[in-house]
Amino acid sequence: KDIPSFVECNPQFNIDTLVNRIKVQVSSHATKIIYVDNLQLLAYNDANQDHDRYGKVCIQLKKLALELNIVIVVLSGLNRQVEYREGYEAKIPQISDLYGSSKIEGLADIILMVFRPAYYNVYYDMEGNEVQNDFCIHVVKHKNGPLGTIKLIFTKETFSLT
């Protein structure tokens, strides 16, 4: 089934501009899903520290989703700590690896963490199984459902998942 959706990735937007743009999109096109890429690029004028800014942006987006009865999917970068950890399991992103993780964790209904071992030059798991083409989506928070891992195969030549 086709669901009206909209992707916004303009790094010049501040949160107020984005909120207005989303409201217009929803009222004009009956959009049900909004994708925002990415949290760290949204400007918030009155917050001095990054974690304050991320928290305020998350709060505004959560309120907007509830007000408009829509889903807002927000992409977020990871901090650099994961790059310094050694081994397969240590490289799997955790909620604490998200920039502004405490606010994101508190407000999000679902948090998915994407992990592609080859990105970190990890080609074998703890049991010695080849993971070079693995692409894992870890469901690390789900307010109304189960946690777990969805394992896909990444094909580098076609940039596709199966």
Predicted regions and their residues:
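Generic structural signal for short, solvent-exposed loop/turn connectors between secondary structure elements
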Residues: 45-50, 160-162
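Conserved inter-motif catalytic segment of the P-loop NTP-binding fold
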Residues: 1-48, 56
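Phosphate-binding/switch region of NTP-binding enzymes
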Residues: 57-162
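Conserved acidic
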Residues: 14, 53, 100
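Secondary-structure capping and boundary motifs in well-ordered enzyme cores
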Residues: 50-53, 131
